[in-house]
UniProtKB/Swiss-Prot annotation:
It is an enzyme of class 3 (hydrolase). Its EC number is 3.5.4.2. Keywords: Hydrolase, Metal-binding, Nucleotide metabolism, Zinc. Binds 1 zinc ion per subunit. It comes from Pseudomonas fluorescens (strain Pf0-1). Catalyzes the hydrolytic deamination of adenine to hypoxanthine. Plays an important role in the purine salvage pathway and in nitrogen catabolism. The active site is at 197 (proton donor). This is Adenine deaminase. Its cofactor is Zn(2+). HAMAP family: Adenine_deaminase. The keyword Metal-binding applies.
Length: 317
């Protein structure tokens, strides 16, 4: 089944480029940039990838991102991810990048963007993988800081297709960012937002009604609110679900408890994604395979999930 799932044409719609930084590349970039790491070797770092919640993961994620300093670093990061896409027949990807993670430590916005954009362009020309880049605001920072990030991004508006919202969810509702999302839409960008991962269903309502999103990232807690479920089904609002991430961060205790197939069978436009694959133990195919292994996902369900991902693209072919 793994090989069949791997060969299935699919799109990935929920992937943080910084979260695809494999330990081997992290160590190589640290050496290139002469950065001392707190881990003695790759295996020690891998052992640190045990998380009880979203915040524990984010602490390590931001620490790891510190090795990314030059446009070449961001190119190498993105290119390594695109090679994984090629291996797994991901024919289209819409990755996130978090400029604030880098600008807050003194890396110029254009250094980050130039490296990523060059790799995505080469990915289309050399690997045949189409893409649309999403600029994501960090929700644990202020709305004013998000506005400043949008200011920095506007001169490069052609390089990305949408804005998103990620990082620590609890205590940072979508409503906190309503004005910056209004402005981004006015500037011509599409919008997506993480909601209903650790946060309550109310955050999903806010993302839909206040941020006017095209897609919900995660959204697994929608199932707790029947009226919300009906709206998501009626309006066919896609959910970019990340099964391995959800179990690794204890949103579900075990994959056998995951609700993605229940939502699929109810008519929700759910998709399968890897989120931060270097940290969560798998890329898209591994996520599909986990659903087969632990939830008995059938080939028919896998085909529908893959088709949903192609249908839910922001960048249409």
């Amino acid at each position: 089944m793994y090989d069949w799932l791997n060969a299935l044409p699919k799109a990935e719609l929920h992937l943080h480029l910084e979260g695809s930084l494999e330990p081997e590349l992290l160590f190589a970039l640290a050496e290139r940039n002469k950065i001392a790491l707190p881990w003695s070797d790759v295996e020690t770092l891998r052992k640190a990838y045990a998380f009880n919640n979203l915040q524990e993961f984010l602490d390590l994620y931001y620490q790891g991102a510190d090795v990314l300093r030059t446009s070449q670093d961001f190119y190498d990061l993105t290119w390594a991810y695109l090679l994984r896409c090629k291996e797994q027949n991901v024919i289209h990807t819409e990755p996130f990048f978090d400029p604030q993670t880098h600008t807050d430590r003194g890396i110029p916005f254009e250094v980050v963007l130039n490296g990523i954009a060059a790799a995505l362009k080469d990915g289309e020309q050399q690997l045949g993988i189409t893409s649309g880049l999403i600029l994501s605001f960090l929700r644990h920072l202020s709305e004013d800081e998000a506005q400043k990030t949008l200011d920095q991004a506007l001169p490069f508006r052609d390089a990305f297709v949408a804005v998103g919202l990620d990082s620590s969810e609890m205590g940072h509702p979508p409503s906190k960012f309503q004005r910056v999302f209004d402005r981004a839409r006015h500037e011509g960008f599409l919008t997506v937002a993480h909601a209903g991962e650790e946060g309550p269903p109310e955050y999903i309502w806010e993302a839909i009604d206040l941020l006017k999103i095209q897609r919900i990232d995660h959204g697994v807690r929608a199932i707790e609110d029947e009226r919300l479920m009906q709206r998501i089904i009626d309006e066919q609002i896609p959910l970019t679900v990340c099964p391995l991430s959800n179990t690794k961060l204890c949103v579900f205790d075990h994959m056998s408890q995951h609700n993605i197939l229940d939502m699929l069978e109810r008519g929700v436009k759910v998709t399968v994604n890897s989120d931060d694959p270097a940290y969560f133990g798998g890329y898209v195919t591994e996520n599909f395979h986990a659903l087969h292994e632990h939830l008995g996902m059938t080939q028919d369900q896998a085909k529908r999930l893959a088709q949903n991902s192609l249908d839910a693209r922001l960048v249409k072919p």
